[in-house]
Amino acid sequence: VINGVINSLIIATCTAVLSIYFSAMTAYSIHVYDFKGKKFIFNFILLIMTIPTQVSALGFFSMCTDWGLRDTYIPLIVPAIAAPAVFFFMIQYMKSSLPIDIIEAARIDGSGEFRTFNTIVLPMLKPALAVQAIFSFVASWNNYFLPSLIIDTSTKKTMPIMIAQLRSADFLKFDMGQVYMFIFI
């Protein structure tokens, strides 16, 4: 049980932190810069959001097998960094509360782009970052589909897989009290 909590905590924390940072950076670049193909890239990211995970699962599984990434946490964390839903909410928040004038003032003062993003933009996005971190953490914590495909070792399994194994261990002698206590922990 403790291994499942720790494994889920590691995966969910890494996913939440990395997805909100890189999604905010992507949203910042599309919101602030004017470049050719900006609208196409924005629409492409939104289009990706409509594709369910299950559609690409077979190719993803075979790629993880070929690259030797099965039974590791990398295939559970790295693809979650490119979170189109988090990107969409971040860019919507930026459109409503991030004035371009502040960014231009930072550029005039000699601030580089990464410094501007990390020291000026991110603190202004704290409410959106907090909300999206919670959403990303919960979504990653509750993810059952990909960990059940990728993780084989019992010591690396996450909480949803352990709960499912507990529920289906013996379907004739099924103790819901034990399952609910396990979920509570």
Located regions from the model:
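A structural signal for multi-pass alpha-helical bundles of membrane permease subunits
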Residues: 1-185
